[in-house]
Amino acid sequence: MARRPWHCYKKIKRPSYQKKRSRSHRKEYVRGGPDSVLRMFDTGNRKRPLGDWELSLGIKIMHDLQLSHRTLEAIRTSLNRNLQKHLTREAFLIRIRPHPWQMIRENKMMAFAGADRLQSGMRNSFGRVMGRAARVHANQTIVEIFCDFQNKDIVIKSLKTAAYKLGAKNRLAVLRMKKPEEHSTKIGLMIALEK
């Protein structure tokens, strides 16, 4: 059966169903479902300390919405592929910020002749888990890339390509910078420095 289009789940309008592993080992309300497609949240040079990078650029989302785990993985692979074409793996670090904890449910319906005799319609319509999502809020950072000033043009171009995969309004921003008084005029992006 084909996947339901994501605009059915994009808005945050339902209660959150999270799959948790508690210490008391009590049964959770959400069971089963597929694992997240997104396995790696950090890609690139993970050995270099974060304080040593000269610059950090990222994508900030403009609205409250849910992002599927497939979207986050598509952003990560797109960035990784584009950056490795031009830079070595030691020259950048990609970090995906939100984690897909929310379980997305679907009440599967049959759509063919005589289907009304085989299914129960909206009775017991809670549905089964069919995927995962991350709930993000306005002005939240989705992805962050650490790099040096000499590679900033390549990183900005890769971020613009990856931003199309979000399917929502977003903007590129400078998140961290060494010596902002020297370099702030040379970047050409909104500066939203994080502590």
Q: What residues fall within each predicted segment?
A:
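Ribosome-associated RNA-binding proteins
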Residues: M1-K195
